[in-house]
């Protein structure tokens, strides 16, 4: 493959423990096949907050807030070997982790 080739993997999840476990599996697989790794780089956590009224009828001042946090990581694989690409395609990650791969 070309010298300047790079694979960028973006991972998103609501649970940071599952996300860290998945990044560890990807890094371990890439290192085992002889690729050079940059990361995992933690990106800012996006927090979506939803405010709803507690009462269905009155009490506008009484509200409840819910939030959902989206944790993100980036892993760059520099100079991947064909074995690295095959191993990453066969890798089975936990449910709840969104994976985006750019070449």
Swiss-Prot record:
Family: Belongs to the universal ribosomal protein uS10 family.
Source organism of this protein record: Magnetococcus marinus (strain ATCC BAA-1437 / JCM 17883 / MC-1)
InterPro entries, sorted: Ribosomal_uS10, Ribosomal_uS10_CS, Ribosomal_uS10_dom, Ribosomal_uS10_dom_sf
HAMAP family: Ribosomal_uS10 (MF_00508)
This protein's UniProt keywords: Ribonucleoprotein, Ribosomal protein
A Gene Ontology term for the protein's cellular component: ribosome
The protein's name in its UniProt record: Small ribosomal subunit protein uS10
Subunit details: Part of the 30S ribosomal subunit.
GO biological process terms held by the UniProt record: translation
One Pfam entry name: Ribosomal_S10
Any GO MF annotation of the entry: tRNA binding
Task performed by this protein: Involved in the binding of tRNA to the ribosomes.
């Amino acid at each position: 493959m070309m010298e300047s080739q790079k694979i960028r993997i973006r991972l998103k999840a609501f649970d940071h423990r599952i996300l860290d476990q998945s990044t560890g599996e990807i890094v371990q697989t890439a290192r085992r096949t002889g690729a050079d790794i940059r990361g995992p780089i933690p990106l800012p956590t996006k927090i979506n907050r939803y405010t709803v009224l507690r009462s269905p009828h009155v009490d506008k001042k009484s509200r409840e807030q819910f939030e959902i946090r989206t944790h993100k990581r980036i892993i760059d694989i520099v100079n991947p070997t064909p074995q690295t690409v095959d191993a990453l395609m066969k890798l089975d990650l936990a449910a709840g982790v969104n994976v985006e791969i750019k070449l």
